[in-house]
Amino acid sequence: DRFEYIYPNYLFAKEFNISKDKNKKVSFVSEGFQKHYQTNTYEAIVVNDIKYNTNQKIFNSGFVNDFEFLIRNVNSDSENSSNYKKDVNYEFLSSVLFKTSYPLIKKGNKNTKYFSPIFSAKYSPNQTKDISNEDRYISYENIFLMDRFGKNDFVEGGQSISLGLEFNNINNSDGRNIFNFGVAQIYRDNENLDLPEKTNLNQKTSDLVGNLNIFPTENFGIEYTFAVDNSLDHNNYNFVKANLKVN
């Protein structure tokens, strides 16, 4: 008989200020779980992260920079698992992320418009864990994040850069973002076949991902998310959502 037994998981997080500059912070996050499933499969995972983050720093030149450094300790114990190595294993991983943008602002009587070219660079000396068979993809919402695959038990190995553009139109009277458009793409020096094929993440050039959000009123809006193939000749993903608020 098959059964599944999931033990309680845990999450602990603590943030430290390491200097008088409140923009420079160190955080510690520890989380873990263990479970039995499919009769004889066992997984126990503990992940400890130490992260240094400068948050956003605005320079006189107009550039907005953000720097992040991650040290990750992954501890696993498993039997008959397709996700983790057999028995007890320990890994120490590291990754660094630098992001910069150059916001351009045009203020009007009714609206304020922001146009921002965005650049980020990631590097890790570690090899990527094989997640090529997992159903994961990149969106504009996560493409510039450290853990952009939504997993905390590995780091993305090698080096890559991400380039993007973002436009926002803000209503001055209520601060509402009435029009937002963002688009971005990942570039690598080498293929990374340990990453999923979806949205061409394992290729030198990923899909062009983006979103378009229109909120003409407080009660109605349309959100469009897309991924254009890296050959730019067809779409690999489209999703449209309408929001209607009734008072």
What is each model feature region?
Residues 1-247:
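Outer-membrane beta-barrel proteins and related beta-barrel translocases across Gram-negative bacteria
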